[in-house]
Regions:
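Eukaryote-biased recognition of intrinsically disordered, low-complexity regulatory segments
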Residues: 11-23
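Iron-sulfur (Fe-S) cluster-binding segments and ferredoxin-like electron-carrier domains
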Residues: 20, 38-41, 45-48, 60-112, ...
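Short, contiguous acidic and Ser/Thr-rich linear segments
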Residues: 27-31
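Conserved small/polar residues in nucleotide/adenosyl-binding loops
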Residues: 140-146
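Helix-enriched interaction subdomains in cytosolic or periplasmic regions
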Residues: 129-138
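Short, structural beta-strand-to-alpha-helix junction motif
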Residues: 34-36
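Charged, low-complexity intrinsically disordered regulatory segments in eukaryotic signaling
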Residues: 1-12
Length: 150
């Protein structure tokens, strides 16, 4: 573990080593670690892909507000999706898998959309029916009414 501090961390028991799997790779951490801290200590920075465009995601915070730390825990019939890695305490033998990728996490097929980022900038779908102005007459009547009249 090259990314771990050699001292500190009053909640971590460095005498009790725990093994776990992330995407099939055998890794290890210590008792008192969260799954997120153990992944970071094992130099696992990429933990998932964005839902829509498959852009790489990593940890940005350490609490319950972390948006990118959702992993699938378990295997087979006991698979539990969308578990937060920042709040899940590490235990021996846990199996964690990243989400939202096709193929391996590092070589995601869906990430081909990165090459089309000039065509699809962030928020492009919010501007779909704004221009041209003269055409707005033809599609404004397609919107549903906000209130129902009885």
């Amino acid at each position: 573990m090259t990314s771990r501090f050699s001292k500190g961390g009053i909640l971590i028991n460095r005498k009790k080593k725990l093994s776990f799997k992330f995407n099939g790779k055998n890794l290890f951490g210590f008792s008192g670690d969260t799954l997120a801290s153990a992944l970071l200590a094992n130099n696992q920075v990429l933990i998932g892909r964005s839902f829509k465009y498959h852009r790489p995601r990593g940890f940005v915070s350490s609490g319950v507000e972390e948006p990118n730390a959702l992993l699938s825990i378990g295997s087979g019939g006991s698979l539990e999706p969308n578990m937060s890695a920042t709040t899940l305490e590490l235990f021996d033998g846990i199996e964690a898998m990243s989400q939202n990728h096709f193929g391996s996490l590092e070589w995601d097929i869906g990430s081909i959309s990165n090459f089309l980022s000039k065509i699809f900038p962030a928020g492009f779908y919010y501007k779909t029916f704004i221009k041209p102005r003269f055409a707005s007459v033809s599609y404004t009547h397609l919107t549903l009414p906000t209130t129902l009249q009885v």
